Amino acid sequence: MKIYGAETTTDEVLEGVSLQGRHFMVTGASSGLGEETVRALSSAGAKVTMVARNSDKLDAAADRIRKSVPTTDLQTGLVDLADLSSIRSYAEEYLQEDAPIDVLINNAGVMACPFMTTKDGFEMQFGTNHLGHFLLTNLLMPAIRSGQNPRIINLSSAGHTHSDVSLDDPNFETSEYNAWESYGRSKSANIHFTREIVRRYGDVIRSFAVHPGVILTELGRHLTPELMEEMVERVKARSTSSAEAKETGGLPFKSMEAGAATQVWAATTDDLEENNGAYLGDCKVGVEGGNPSENGYLPYIYNEDTAKALWSLSEQMVQQEFPSS
């Protein structure tokens, strides 16, 4: 077993690994971690379907990857995760191709935006980060289940420490909106979703939730100095790291290649067979109560009752039920 850490890069994770014959789908693939994930997987011989909502940005990212990896086998697909009709249209179109998906990487997301709603009226962060991926994943489940050793990777975050999910008020209809609390709810939802996938389909599917670390990407486009300060204070209040790390909020920045490494590791390694459903960070299995800026998590994210209830709530919100096994 190779030993990895916070500075491990995607290329180091895939050193000596052949992904020939494997098909990956990556959401949010038009920039940042998604684009780097696609580049790395392509360099190891994988076929990759890049999914994003902006056609110009998606085509530009695909062109950059083709220049970097001339032998790459890329497809693209347009999906707006803030629009359930867009998700349904894409899934219906994709399933007509009868093409198995070996690994789905739910990478797309929005962070700490001002209060706004999706096309269907859901609070934007919960609606995009969780509900959009919840619907897309379930609609694509026939293709995933027909894949070879299928996996579903959900991009979560240390941001889950800001808040657990709210089953009573997911859209902030009766409580005051806070950008970081909303982000925390959505990132906790990603983990509960992962856990419930495993409970329902773990005999066939491996699923992991991933903390990428802190990376400068388009995800931070809504961040103001005030929001950054609030984030640091929130992390410091929850950090179990050293006093020195707490002074900076325990927020070491990573390169793009290091930031995407954990999700690439989760999508490809054979070292996680005994850890199905785990929360991962720095290419390691998560540690309850550990430093959240590394691979630490709060215990509420492994609550089975919450995961079941969130699944039921999500079905109600997207107005569609899915098989339990």
Show which residues each predicted segment covers:
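NAD(P)H-dependent oxidoreductase Rossmann-fold/reductase module
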Residues: M1-L84, R88-S89, E93-L104, M111, ...
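Mid-sequence acidic-hydrophobic segments that form the walls
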Residues: Y94-E97, N107, M111, T128, ...
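Amphipathic alpha-helical dimer-interface segment in Rossmann-like NAD(P)H-dependent oxidoreductases
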Residues: T128-Q148, D164, V198-R199
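Short alpha-helical oligomerization interface
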Residues: C113-T128, T174-E176
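Extended catalytic-interface subdomain
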Residues: I153-N154
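Conserved acidic residues
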Residues: D102, E123, P150
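A short helix->loop->beta-strand "cap" motif at the edges of active sites that frequently abuts
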Residues: A46, G147-P150
